[in-house]
Design a protein with these regions (language model features):
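Glycine-rich, proline-tolerant flexible connector loops at the mouths of alpha/beta enzymes
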Residues: 36-41, 92-112
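Alpha-helix-loop-beta-strand connector modules within alpha/beta enzyme cores
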Residues: 51-62, 106-130
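Glycine-rich, positively charged N-terminal anion/phosphate-binding segment
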Residues: 8-79
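Glycine-enriched alpha-helix->loop->beta-strand junction motifs that scaffold or abut catalytic
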Residues: 24-28, 84-86, 126
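General structural feature for long, well-ordered alpha-helical segments within catalytic domains
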Residues: 4, 16, 72, 76, ...
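Short, charged beta->alpha transition segments
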Residues: 74-78, 83, 87-88, 115-122
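Non-cysteine beta-strand/loop elements that form the S-adenosyl-L-methionine
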Residues: 32, 85-95
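Structural preference for beta-strand elements that scaffold enzyme active sites
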Residues: 2-4, 29, 60-64, 87-89, ...
């Protein structure tokens, strides 16, 4: 059996993950709180702190992206690959009302044609494991 550590908003940042890993370990993958790319390139300070390799040494980290924009997703994947990440998680499960209202997370699932186009584009333009 594999054990995956899912993020809880505002709680399971890199400090918590490191403390948990040092005390308990036995987690196969730690998923980061989501990165939510916008038209502004780069990461917020919080996002950067959560994904910096120096803040996650020895942890099997999977960065998570929350977007419905293929261009932003691909740009963010490339930035994450520059940090050494080769596996990325696309968040299609967040049920938060503010996220769903923007047709992101689980809200993107109801937009089948848009989701199909999005997936076609990201899989054709990215070689990361998604």
């Amino acid at each position: 059996m594999k054990y995956y550590f899912a993020p809880l908003e505002g709680i399971t940042g890199y400090i918590y993950r490191n403390a948990y890993h040092n005390l308990f370990g036995q987690i196969d993958k730690y998923f980061t709180p989501f990165v939510s790319p916008t038209s502004n390139e780069g990461f917020t300070t919080r996002e950067l702190n959560d994904i910096l390799p120096a803040h996650n040494e020895g942890l099997p980290i999977i960065p998570q992206i929350l977007t419905n924009n293929a261009e932003y997703f691909i740009r963010t994947v490339n930035a994450l690959k520059d940090f050494g990440y080769d596996e990325i998680n696309l968040n299609l499960g967040c049920p938060s009302g503010t996220v769903v209202a923007k047709h992101k997370g689980s809200g993107f699932l109801s937009e089948r044609e848009d989701l199909d186009r999005f997936l076609d584009e990201i899989f054709s333009k990215s070689n990361a494991k998604i």
